[in-house]
């Protein structure tokens, strides 16, 4: 089979601590979105065949929506999929700042996912700390205790944040809870999964696009623990990046250890 024209290279990376990360660089954000969607669809079918369900955790930000639109067009066993949020902004229902608003438009309105298998973060609650604790209980009810998610999609911010684990926030230090409240960031408080459930998940899928991510992608692949994303330490992590984000990777990083 001839190689895909939109795939620039596919390599394996060894990051600090000997953790293997698979890196795939594609032509542009559209190609990354299609590839990510295909990987999620395959993971869903495999999980349902093996375990009878697939628990997918989706991050917010600006990068997921192309991926989720592509996913809506693929063969996915939606009746056995459970969808949870990695993070959410504290904002009113339907507000454009809410990740759920975009999740609804890009995916949920377009697929037959049972409503009772969609688990929005409860950011409208009056007591957000109690709501975060309840959300963690809900997740453990569908994905076990300790919580093990099947696939977690993560993005990467230009400041090195991932999920809503942002530089300097106390949520970075939370290890005794699976869900935490983060302080105001870009004008909004956030609810977020913490490092323990991210690192316990069966699989991590990083989706990184755009030239503003070049330095942070290099640092992520180098295992730089001074950035929040660098503390996601997972033996089954895959990074999909476009050419713009990968523009400053060294020959060694592209070649692998």
Language-model features, listed with the residues they occupy:
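N-terminal glycine-/serine-/threonine-rich phosphate-binding loop
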Residues: 13-56
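Glycine-rich N-terminal segment of FAD-binding domains in flavoprotein oxidoreductases
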Residues: 49-72
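Glycine-rich beta-strand-to-loop/alpha-helix junction loops that act as flexible
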Residues: 58-63, 154-158, 209
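A glycine- and small-aliphatic-rich helix-loop capping segment at beta-alpha/alpha-beta transitions
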Residues: 70-78, 101, 105, 167-175
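Ligand-binding beta-strand-loop-alpha-helix segment within the catalytic cores
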Residues: 79-153
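Class I SAM-dependent methyltransferase SAM-binding "motif I" and its flanking Rossmann-like core
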Residues: 151-196
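C-terminal functional extensions of proteins
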Residues: 198-257
